[in-house]
Amino acid sequence: LIALDLDTPVVALESTVITHGLPRPQNLQLARDMEKAVREAGATPATVALLEGKIHIGLSDGELVRLADSESTLKVSHRDFATAIVKKADGGTTVAGTMYAANMAGIKVFATGGIGGVHKESAFDISTDLRSLAEIPTIVVCAGAKAILDLPATLEYLETMGVPVVGYQTDEFPA
């Protein structure tokens, strides 16, 4: 990514919102809007995805269209990279997957709508996003955890794992 070589600010963006989060054509519009918002804030957007089994950090508009239009993309978390690469698959990266790839590329800031967390009334369903937040040295800017989750348990898990949670203009853990 040229922006990293020039020592300019770079913000990583996930791609599962494009591949699995929203229907067409809203998914493509959101991808373009996210990149536009990063540019307007003075940084370079770097949407992370897999294309033909290769990790891409920063996508062209044509690549965004390809992801948005595809019905066969994989959902790629941290644990799924090896399988997706071997299959030469296209894939949208989750929060954990994006953090992993961005960190390997030297990107330290990542923005997303919402992180995963501890699921309600579940035997033991905890998103790998939380472990990644504890282990990968990346600043994650988000609107909070997804509203369908057990927010108090998610916040407790983050505290237990030593993840600082900082709210901007709020005293609550937002969803």
Labelled PLM ranges:
Residues 9-11, 15, 32-36, 159-167:
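Internal alpha/beta core interface subdomains
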Residues 11-13, 45-50, 91, 109-114, ...:
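General beta-strand structural signal in soluble alpha/beta enzymes
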Residues 15, 20-22, 28-85:
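Glycine-rich nucleotide/cofactor/substrate-binding loop typically near the N-terminus or early
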Residues 25-30, 63-68, 117-134, 157:
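A glycine- and small-aliphatic-rich helix-loop capping segment at beta-alpha/alpha-beta transitions
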Residues 25-32, 89-97:
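Glycine-rich anion/phosphate-binding loops
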